[in-house]
């Protein structure tokens, strides 16, 4: 790793408990290996709302509404070491969390 590179880890999940747990694991692992951390930064929650008619034919007033919330977090690891990268690769996160990793100069 170059000394001036940063690792940006972006997490997405529908369950806020899972994303908080995964974020805590990433932060603890990075701190344990001696890297500096920026975050976790909570990003805006994306809310999708769906309205479905409950009746197949009549009663337009009878509807159900559903909401799907996507929680997002950003963790930036400043000046990571080889030890940090190895520890993050071995980390086993929850199945309901989408992880995107990018390198930033």
UniProtKB/Swiss-Prot annotation:
Superkingdom: Bacteria
One Gene Ontology biological process: translation
Keyword set, alphabetical order: Ribonucleoprotein, Ribosomal protein
Record keyword RNA-binding present: no
SUPFAM superfamilies: Ribosomal protein S10
GO MF terms held by the record: structural constituent of ribosome; tRNA binding
GO cellular component: ribonucleoprotein complex; ribosome
InterPro entries: Ribosomal_uS10 (IPR001848), Ribosomal_uS10_dom (IPR027486), Ribosomal_uS10_dom_sf (IPR036838)
Keyword set includes Lyase: no
Family: Belongs to the universal ribosomal protein uS10 family.
Self-association state and partner proteins as the record states: Part of the 30S ribosomal subunit.
Function comment: Involved in the binding of tRNA to the ribosomes.
Name of the protein in its database record: Small ribosomal subunit protein uS10
Organism of provenance: Legionella pneumophila subsp. pneumophila (strain Philadelphia 1 / ATCC 33152 / DSM 7513)
Protein encoded by which gene: rpsJ
């Amino acid at each position: 790793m170059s000394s001036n590179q940063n690792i940006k880890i972006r997490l997405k999940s529908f369950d806020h408990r899972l994303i908080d747990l995964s974020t805590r694991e990433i932060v603890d692992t990075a701190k344990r290996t001696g890297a500096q951390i920026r975050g976790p930064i909570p990003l805006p929650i994306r809310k999708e709302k769906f309205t479905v008619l409950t009746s197949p034919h009549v009663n337009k007033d009878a509807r159900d509404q559903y909401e799907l919330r996507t929680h997002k977090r950003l963790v930036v690891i400043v000046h990571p070491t080889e030890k940090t990268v190895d520890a993050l690769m071995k980390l086993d996160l929850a199945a309901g969390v989408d992880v995107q990793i990018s390198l930033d100069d």
